[in-house]
Amino acid sequence: MKPVVKEYTNDEQLMKDVEELQKMGVAKEDVYVLAHDDDRTERLADNTNANTIGAKETGFKHAVGNIFNKKGDELRNKIHEIGFSEDEAAQFEKRLDEGKVLLFVTDNEKVKAWA
């Protein structure tokens, strides 16, 4: 099953939603943030106690390959590796290009009502 996705333009709302997810019992391991800029992704993940999509999720081979990819390719690969088609990943990447931040939740059972 694909992760649940929400997009944000407001970092504060993202932080509130991650806090709400934690109160619902969603584990940190099931919550991922992704922004176009690596620094923003890391900062948001640290501030919200969420994860980033890294080698654990994409596999070592893809993680190393992402080092040599263009930014758009890297983002699409990360999104594709957590369960989305290449077309869906391309659509999400366009949203990231627009400055939006994406929140992915892989525990679908706990977030049915939330999404």
Curated annotation (Swiss-Prot):
Listed Pfam families: YflT
Keywords: Stress response
InterPro entries, per database record: GSP17M-like_dom
Induction: By heat shock, salt stress, oxidative stress, glucose limitation and oxygen limitation.
Protein name, as recorded: General stress protein 17M
